[in-house]
Amino acid sequence: MAVIGIDLGTTNSCVAVMEGGDAKAIENSEGARTTPSIVAFTDSERLVGDPAKRQATTNAKNTIYASKRLIGRRYQDVKDIKSSYEVVSAKNGDAWIKVLGKEYSPSQIGAFVLEKMKETAERHLGHKVEKAVITVPAYFNDAQRQATKDAGKIAGLDVIRIINEPTAAALAYGLNKSDKQKVIAVYDLGGGTFDVSILEIADGVFEVKATNGDTMLGGEDFDHAIMDYLMDDFKKTTGIDLHNDAMAVQRIKEASEKAKIELSNRMETDINLPFISSDSTGPKHLSLKLTRAKFENLVDDLIQRTIEPCKKALKDAGISADKIDEVVLVGGMTRVPKVIQKVKEFFGREPHKGVNPDEVVAIGAAIQGSILAGDVRDVLLLDVTPLSLGIETLGGVFTPLIERNTTIPTKKSQVFSTAEDGQTAVTIKVYQGERKMAADNKLLGQFSLEGIPSAPRGMPQIEVTFDIDANGIVHVSAKDKASGKEQAIKIQSSGGLSDDEIQRMIKEAEQKAGEDEKRKKFIELKNNGENLVHSTEKSLNEYGDKIPNSDRLEIENAIRDVRDALGNSDVESVDILQQKVDHLMKVSMKLGEALYGNANNTSSTESTTTNNNNEEDSKVVDSDYQEIDKKDGK
């Protein structure tokens, strides 16, 4: 069974699969190979992708976009993020999203998008899909990776590997290339995150030497730069502040994104938003010409922010920019001319443009899926952990055990002991990050080692092992060195979803899938009902005088019943609607029977007349023939 590759992006998502030795991105039900990572809620249904995006202007508060920026993050870290929807703090301190009175974890929102990707693949392949490789930004920490894996689980997928986006892109770029050893840089500027990875490719071995990035830098920030400029200009011109007008902000967001895209190919673009607001003097319109030069000026600091991670990645890899053989551009934002120019200036070479920046990550994930399934051989992928892993030691200092850019999977052990006489439990706090003080890094969890035999301080020898798997996810174990027995460890995660929460969300997803199927059936039935009413009324107007009044009245009553049932938007009324439609279909057949009956009678009459005429004609001919014979006989 095929293993699909999914690029779960901030702005757009993509799914790919290996077919006949080649990986290809799959078109969704709307005919596009990328799907907006947008989820919207109405009183009656949930929308994903393009349908959600199309209604965003009129339903801004209930339309969720860029939720990837919240996944695996604490509320305190993201409370200042600009969004049209409400971000709240969950019980465990994580950032969740509140819509129509209900709270959703970012993993759930991601799962809705993954379900769409799963359905897209299943429609293309013609069978169920269970296994997937999902990509994440290289600079995602453990909590963000685990939350992404949870999203896959909620969506009904067995996520067999989490792979870094730049690494996936390198895999798609370098597979089947016969070149000798190459050192490449993957510059990945997407909708919400930025990553840069330095890789060495040789004889089918893809080895990541170093990675760096910024998980809060991407196309969303470019959009906001334009949005702020437009709203500030509008306020100066009219005195009206649009920041608190959700519908206006959504319209400006869409216009800003469109302008950003157009300015990649044009030197200027017009932004026109009529009736964006009003005051006592009447309606107000937002109309402005945005040049590429002005746009580049607005986002120059954002583009410049990508350079420092590039410098750090090169330093960690131990090479200089002039030693890079190829620079591969990934992510939709790398179409911006100023970005291309900045990359060229920094690396001193023209970037490689032979890959589709929107699809290459998903294609790489599909290739990795085939490698894990054993379908693609002689390819080895060696990735690294993007952040250091360590513990809090005396004075709140962060002591790394596994340094950043260590090849994964990896394992390292450290022996700990007690700080006081007779101590029978020790709490160890595990952090991930690069700051010197533990509190400034990401707390992954704390370990309570209980049941330690009472002894003088410093005597117990407890070996704690930190293990980072191929997904970049951290695992911890511990044992008492004196006895060799494993000790019980209670891990109290600082956040994330519990197993019970994940199972609840899986059940909700399954239930929602059933509801979605019922709604789909309901909508199809309503369409059929409306078409039946229209065609029956048309036939009744044209041929109603050809049937008995009792039949006509019965058909009119059936039409009225269907029309009344169509006015009910409750999905649970699908059975009632089905009965009404079936009844109308049955009684309307009387109209058809009458029409065809009349047609047959007319046809029969015409046939009889024709036959009689033929007989008379035959007699005339015979008579003439006989007369001719008589003449010939004379």
UniProtKB/Swiss-Prot annotation:
PANTHER family under this entry? HEAT SHOCK PROTEIN 70KDA
Show the InterPro entries listed in the entry.
Answer: ATPase_NBD, Chaperone_DnaK, Heat_shock_70_CS, HSP70_C_sf, HSP70_peptide-bd_sf, Hsp_70_fam
Induction section of the entry: By stress conditions e.g. heat shock.
Q: Where Phosphothreonine occurs along the chain?
A: 193
Its family remark reads: Belongs to the heat shock protein 70 family.
Which GO-annotated molecular functions does the record name? Answer: ATP binding; ATP-dependent protein folding chaperone; unfolded protein binding
SUPFAM superfamilies of this UniProt entry?
Actin-like ATPase domain, Heat shock protein 70kD (HSP70), C-terminal subdomain, Heat shock protein 70kD (HSP70), peptide-binding domain
Q: Which gene encodes it?
A: dnaK
Instruction: Provide the function of this protein.
Output: Acts as a chaperone.
- Protein name per the record: Chaperone protein DnaK
Q: Where is the composition biased (Basic and acidic residues)?
A: 616-634
Keywords of the record, alphabetical order, are:
ATP-binding, Chaperone, Nucleotide-binding, Phosphoprotein, Stress response
Low complexity composition-biased segments: 600-613
